UniProtKB/Swiss-Prot annotation:
<feature type="topological domain" description="Extracellular">
    <location>
        <begin position="29"/>
        <end position="81"/>
    </location>
</feature>
<comment type="function">
    <text>Can associate with other claudins to regulate tight junction structural and functional strand dynamics. May coassemble with CLDN8 into tight junction strands containing anion-selective channels that convey paracellular chloride permeability in renal collecting ducts. May integrate into CLDN3 strands to modulate localized tight junction barrier properties. May disrupt strand assembly of channel-forming CLDN2 and CLDN15 and inhibit cation conductance. Cannot form tight junction strands on its own.</text>
</comment>
<feature type="transmembrane region" description="Helical">
    <location>
        <begin position="82"/>
        <end position="102"/>
    </location>
</feature>
<keyword id="KW-0965">Cell junction</keyword>
<feature type="topological domain" description="Extracellular">
    <location>
        <begin position="139"/>
        <end position="160"/>
    </location>
</feature>
<protein>
    <recommendedName>
        <fullName>Claudin-4</fullName>
    </recommendedName>
</protein>
<dbReference type="GO" id="GO:0005254">
    <property type="term" value="F:chloride channel activity"/>
</dbReference>
<feature type="topological domain" description="Cytoplasmic">
    <location>
        <begin position="182"/>
        <end position="210"/>
    </location>
</feature>
<dbReference type="GO" id="GO:0005923">
    <property type="term" value="C:bicellular tight junction"/>
</dbReference>
<keyword id="KW-0813">Transport</keyword>
<feature type="transmembrane region" description="Helical">
    <location>
        <begin position="118"/>
        <end position="138"/>
    </location>
</feature>
<feature type="modified residue" description="Phosphotyrosine">
    <location>
        <position position="209"/>
    </location>
</feature>
<keyword id="KW-0597">Phosphoprotein</keyword>
<feature type="topological domain" description="Cytoplasmic">
    <location>
        <begin position="103"/>
        <end position="117"/>
    </location>
</feature>
<keyword id="KW-0796">Tight junction</keyword>
<keyword id="KW-0869">Chloride channel</keyword>
<keyword id="KW-0407">Ion channel</keyword>
Length: 210
């Protein structure tokens, strides 16, 4: 059975990954202005997130606007919004399961049931980590593809924002924490040892009959 220290480390890493996923989802920095071509000298920077976009002036003033329509978002950001929300919900469920199945809690008395609950929590964290990695990698791939596409004007090219890096870090923490929790093996049932004796065959003394 995995030690309590390994279990606590797995839960801590998964919780950090969950918080990182929330931060990545909330920050409006999935795409940022690429300072190339005609954008080398500009007085403003554009941030694009899942829920809003922001314009940062050179003076430090920032104005943010929530998207008016979901259909106005690019396809990758629409998918990223859905996957990130599902990932955060799954990670929250994993945190709840890890608390229920923790060795230091008394929510479940049976040690075997506790270990199985922790394994389920680990699998949930692994799924949440994958759901964070997919939109972050997909968005990064589209940004890089458009950046090197000569048909895209420089004013529409973007660079990877901080939210993507936070998302990758959160995904790694969720995957690592989930893997550690999956190491919880249910204890084997201790069966009482029963000694079996076999009666020795007795040979009767030979009798001589007349």
């Amino acid at each position: 059975m995995a030690s309590m220290g390994l279990q606590v480390m797995g839960i801590a890493l998964a919780v950090l990954g969950w918080l990182g996923a929330i931060l990545s989802c909330a920050l409006p920095m999935w795409r940022v202005t690429a300072f190339i071509g005609s954008n080398i000298v500009t007085s403003q920077t554009i941030w694009e997130g899942l829920w809003m976009n922001c314009v940062v002036q050179s003076t430090g003033q920032m104005q943010c606007k929530v998207y008016d329509s979901l259909l106005a978002l690019p396809q990758d950001l629409q998918a990223a919004r859905a996957l990130m929300v599902v990932s955060i919900i799954l990670a929250a469920l994993g945190v709840l399961l890890s608390v229920v199945g923790g060795k230091c809690t008394n929510c479940v008395e049976d040690e075997s049931a506790k270990a199985k609950t922790m394994i389920v929590a680990g699998v949930v964290f692994l799924l949440a980590g994958l759901l964070v990695m997919v939109p972050a990698s997909w968005t990064a791939n589209n940004i890089i593809r458009d950046f090197y596409n000569p048909l895209v004007v420089s004013g529409q090219k973007r660079e990877m924002g901080a939210s993507l890096y936070v998302g990758w870090a959160a995904s790694g923490l969720l995957l690592l924490g989930g893997a550690l929790l999956c190491c919880n093996c249910p204890p084997r049932a201790d069966k009482p040892y029963s000694a079996k004796y076999s009666a020795a065959a007795r040979s009767a003394p030979a009798s001589n009959y007349v």
